[in-house]
A protein has these predicted regions:
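Extracytoplasmic
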Residues: 2-16, 26-93
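Conserved beta3-strand ATP-binding lysine motif
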Residues: 23
Length: 93
């Protein structure tokens, strides 16, 4: 079997991907609602534990192939999240 697993392909990616951090939330219900709002608007979003405050969960939108892709959609992303500014982060699965 010469078909590589998806994990091995992802591990071999040699270019950067980017995500847009829209916030960190303490309520699991809020995290679910925010992720659903992005999904309803055609943007993939996911959650991960907040690194500096273990009681919070960070919501990230993406991944995007470039920072410019995020900047192009930033006004819409901010509106969906109800924020004025998020953070563009280099993402490595």
């Amino acid at each position: 079997d010469n078909i590589a697993s998806a994990k091995s392909i992802i591990e071999e990616i040699d270019f950067d991907l980017y995500v847009y951090k829209v916030g960190a939330f303490g309520s699991p219900e809020t995290v679910t609602k925010v992720i659903q709002s992005f999904g309803d608007n055609g943007f993939p979003a996911f959650a991960k534990p907040n690194e500096s405050n273990k009681t919070l969960t960070t919501v990230l939108v993406g991944p995007f192939v470039s920072k410019d892709d995020i900047r192009t959609n930033q006004t819409v992303l901010n509106k969906i999240a109800g924020i004025t500014m998020g953070e563009i982060i280099t993402w490595n699965p």
